[in-house]
């Protein structure tokens, strides 16, 4: 597949695989993370998700402009570093349902979008530049096929990796993921903050948890621990 291709293609394709793996791992769990950790409904979560994607697709315009004034390679390297910092910040477990944690998250998303803008389009230009040499010009189309295949390889393993990291974190606390529990736990904690625990929701949490083999001795403690553990698992997924 790489036979007779310039050696730089190996490096650029591998970088593309790694970047897309991290990006799609994050996207696979991002909405669930927002809803679990902060108790956002689907509308608010969707707005944050859409805003992030808008930045991701807008920033390459800035990245291309900077590359013309700086250089493609410097933009790519800087983009990798900025993205790494952004993912590292997202991987750090912070308090659930707090304004401070949300501010940290939004800062991390800004870093990731900026890094992606510096990295993504400029990496493709670097691939194309490898084939300006007449020796390799006839292989340009096959090179980009390999390059885009690298995207799919990274994306293919992302969802299962995110799920595995979440399950590891949950299993360490003898918890099991259930799609209903994050919302119910947040609703119950909201009712506590409002001054009166919602007994009906508490009963639902207890029933679902018991059916899954989880022990609930105190609903408030269980709900808090469940959200904290699930959020930590998602954070681990961001750091992969």
Where are these regions (language model features)?
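Short amphipathic helix-loop junctions that connect adjacent transmembrane helices
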Residues: 26-48, 167
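Cytoplasmic membrane-interface "Motif A"-like loop-to-helix N-cap segments
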Residues: 68-83, 138
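Hydrophobic core of transmembrane alpha-helices in multi-pass small-molecule transporters
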Residues: 17, 86, 100-122
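Central cavity-lining transmembrane alpha-helices of secondary-active solute carriers
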Residues: 47-68, 84, 156-157
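Symmetry-related core transmembrane helices of the 12-TM Major Facilitator Superfamily/SLC fold
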Residues: 106, 178-186, 231-240
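Glycine-rich segments within core transmembrane alpha-helices of 12-TM secondary carriers
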Residues: 56, 141-167, 213-216, 240
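C-terminal ends and interior cores of transmembrane alpha-helices
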Residues: 78-100, 105
């Amino acid at each position: 597949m790489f036979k007779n291709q310039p050696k730089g293609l190996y490096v650029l394709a591998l970088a593309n695989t790694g970047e897309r793996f991290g990006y799609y791992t994050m996207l696979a769990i991002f909405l669930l993370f927002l809803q679990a950790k902060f108790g956002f409904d689907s509308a608010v979560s969707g707005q944050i998700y859409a805003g992030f994607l808008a930045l991701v697709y807008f920033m390459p315009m800035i990245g291309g402009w900077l590359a013309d004034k700086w250089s493609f390679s410097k933009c790519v390297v800087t983009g990798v570093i900025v993205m790494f910092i952004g993912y590292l910040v997202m991987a750090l477990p912070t308090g659930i349902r707090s304004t401070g944690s949300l501010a940290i998250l939004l800062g991390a998303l800004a870093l990731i979008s900026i890094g992606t803008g510096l990295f993504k389009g400029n990496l493709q230009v670097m691939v194309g530049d490898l084939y300006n040499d007449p020796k390799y010009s006839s292989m340009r189309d096959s090179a980009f096929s390999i390059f885009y295949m690298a995207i799919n390889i990274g994306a293919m393993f992302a969802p299962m990796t995110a799920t595995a990291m979440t399950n590891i974190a949950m299993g360490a606390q003898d918890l099991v993921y259930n799609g209903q529990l994050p919302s119910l736990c947040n609703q119950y904690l909201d009712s506590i903050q409002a001054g009166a625990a919602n007994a009906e929701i508490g009963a639902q949490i207890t029933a679902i948890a018991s059916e899954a083999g989880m022990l609930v001795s105190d609903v408030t403690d269980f709900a808090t621990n469940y959200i904290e553990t699930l959020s930590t698992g998602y954070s681990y997924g961001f750091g992969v």
